[in-house]
């Protein structure tokens, strides 16, 4: 967090950071709500001298040291559905939190019901849910400035022993063991990276120069057998001159520019049943997914795909 009150960052897992009356130059009232802990009401934020970086513990220490701020106990247990917490939510302009993933869809609905701006943590796969994806498609929710190719790190709770976790589930930074989570930030606050155009090659250039063996040297891109679109297995392999529909991995969303592409839909809702196309035993069965032909009478089932279309086709 930089030394000015214009840039604020969220607290750790399990907390809810809500900003109220943030149009004031001093951000006069902000409310932080902790599940099962006191609510921390920040009435005043001073500028921090210097241009150095501060970690969250240092920021929290300075906020607590300000006598104009106060700790007050919650009457309940901090459940976001309680009248008490909804009252705090109504006062806020921006909510920053790590909501319970098991109640994520209900939590997001509450934020939209109250027309709140937010920056929240989401499991990467949650964005394919039928309640969440339509919000992404309608440009009402999008991925923050985080990468699908990286996991978020969380400080390990005292009751959790990192040594009992698989090595792949932890990461040590400067001697501190963090727990890894396949999560991303999602938000309805616009940000500059969201409007940076993807630099892309044409289809011909991709087939000749792509760094991916799945693309380079082929005569053409694969087409799905159960939906009319081409398969683009990598975001950087999207052909800049293709005007039709394309299926891309969900990791495309951290590079999605709504000025450059239109989101048409998702394979979960658009894939035609393979039972109407191919004989049983020639493909792996499962929920709605796109399939491509192997060329030997069998078919490959793909991971979830987002269907997009270039906006150049409309210009």
Predicted regions and their residues:
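Class I S-adenosyl-L-methionine-dependent methyltransferase catalytic core
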Residues: 1-96, 100-315
């Amino acid at each position: 967090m930089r030394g000015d009150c214009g840039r604020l960052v969220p607290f750790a897992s399990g907390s809810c950071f809500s900003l109220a009356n943030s149009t004031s130059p001093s951000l006069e009232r902000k409310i932080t709500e902790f599940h099962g802990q006191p609510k921390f009401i920040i009435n005043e934020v001073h500028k921090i001298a210097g241009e150095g970086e501060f970690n969250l513990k240092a920021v929290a220490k300075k906020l607590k040291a300000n006598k104009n701020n106060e700790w007050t106990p919650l009457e309940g247990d901090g459940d976001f559905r309680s009248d008490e917490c909804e009252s705090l939510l109504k006062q806020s302009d921006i909510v920053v939190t790590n909501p319970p993933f098991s109640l994520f869809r209900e939590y997001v609905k509450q934020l939209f019901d109250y027309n709140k701006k937010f920056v929240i943590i989401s499991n990467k796969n949650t964005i394919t849910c039928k309640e969440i994806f339509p919000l992404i498609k309608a440009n009402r929710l999008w991925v923050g400035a985080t990468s699908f190719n990286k996991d978020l790190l969380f400080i390990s709770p005292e009751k959790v022993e990192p040594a009992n976790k698989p090595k792949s589930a932890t990461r040590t930074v400067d001697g501190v063991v963090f727990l890894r989570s396949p999560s991303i930030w999602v938000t309805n606050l616009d940000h500059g990276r969201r409007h940076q155009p993807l630099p892309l090659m044409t289809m011909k250039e991709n087939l000749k120069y792509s760094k991916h063996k799945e693309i380079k040297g082929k005569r053409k891109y694969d087409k799905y057998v159960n939906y009319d679109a081409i398969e683009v297995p990598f975001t950087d392999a999207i052909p800049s001159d293709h005007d039709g529909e394309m299926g891309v991995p969900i990791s495309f969303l951290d590079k999605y520019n709504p000025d450059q592409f239109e989101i048409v839909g998702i394979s979960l809702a658009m894939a035609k049943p393979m039972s109407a196309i191919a004989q049983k035993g020639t493909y792996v069965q499962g929920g709605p997914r796109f399939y491509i032909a192997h060329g030997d009478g069998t078919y490959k089932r793909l991971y979830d795909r987002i269907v997009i279309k270039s906006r150049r086709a409309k210009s």
